[in-house]
UniProtKB/Swiss-Prot annotation:
UniProt protein name: Homeobox protein Hox-D8
PANTHER family, A to Z: HOMEOBOX DOMAIN-CONTAINING PROTEIN (PTHR46166), HOMEOBOX PROTEIN HOX-D8 (PTHR46166:SF1)
Keyword Hydrolase attached: no
Short name of one Pfam family: Homeodomain
Lineage of origin: Eukaryota, Metazoa, Chordata, Craniata, Vertebrata
UniProt feature, compositional bias: Basic and acidic residues: 204-227
Family stated for the protein in its record: Belongs to the Antp homeobox family.
Predominant location category: nucleus
GO cellular component term of the entry, any: nucleus
Length: 240
């Protein structure tokens, strides 16, 4: 560290120069700037004395400022106070105390290593008492509302039974829907969607808005057609 940083309040110019450096924001009297530069060395440290205000500023004789941690060079300036206050002396003592205290702790607790290795292991009685939890339908993970569900695939047996049920009655009641879902291993929603899709397919294929509910309806329609045909024949004969 240069001597200028040790004592920045004294001139760095040689004696006899006409100009002296100016100090910015200096709270000390102007006679400090007019003093000659001090040649630092082992011989000059005995005759050097700090001004009263400088000593108050650095050694906190009457100043209330906090400690700035300023350390003087012991080679160039006379040491003031106890040598135990030098830089690094306190740290060495603390380091030695820490090492001795750490060794005492290790001697006092020799089983620290063995106990720390068993932290991740669980006690055996906890594993023995733990039983598999019962899963309820509401505990199962459900798909997110914004996520699209996958396409449901039906087996050949399921499609055959559903087709039979559709031919018998294209509309299912709630009771019948529950019976079909339990018989085929499906949910009520899956059975409902299958019947909706099947009805739309039948309408597209036949171009009709209504479904034949039973065979009696078909027979009634045929009877009506047969009755209308002879009536038309009689009207034609009369016109002639």
């Amino acid at each position: 560290m240069s001597s200028y940083f040790v004592n920045p309040f004294y001139s760095k110019y040689k004696p006899g120069e006409a100009l002296s450096p100016t100090y910015y924001d200096c709270r000390f009297p102007q006679d400090v700037t007019s003093r000659h530069a001090v040649v630092y060395g082992p011989s000059s440290g005995a005759s050097f004395q700090h001004p009263a205000q400088v000593q108050d500023f650095y050694h906190h004789g009457t100043s209330a400022l906090p400690n700035t941690g300023f350390q003087q060079n012991p080679c160039g300036i006379t040491c003031h106070g106890d040598p135990s206050k030098f830089y690094g002396y306190d740290n060495l003592q603390r380091q030695q105390i820490f090492t001795t205290q750490q060794e005492a702790d290790l001697v006092q607790y020799p089983d620290c290593k063995s106990s720390s290795s068993n932290i991740g292991e669980e006690p055996e009685h906890l594993n023995q008492n733990s039983s598999p939890t019962q899963m309820f339908p509401w505990m199962r993970p459900q798909a997110a509302p914004g996520r699209r569900r996958g396409r449901q695939t039906y087996s050949r047996f399921q499609t055959l039974e559903l087709e039979k049920e559709f031919l018998f009655n294209p509309y299912l009641t709630r009771k019948r829907r529950i019976e079909v879902s339990h018989a085929l291993g499906l949910t009520e929603r899956q059975v409902k969607i299958w019947f909706q899709n099947r009805r739309m397919k039948w309408k597209k294929e036949n171009n009709k808005d209504k479904f034949p509910t039973s065979r009696n309806d078909d027979e009634d329609e045929e009877v009506k057609k047969e009755q209308e045909e002879p009536e038309q024949e009689t009207t034609e004969k009369e016109t002639k």
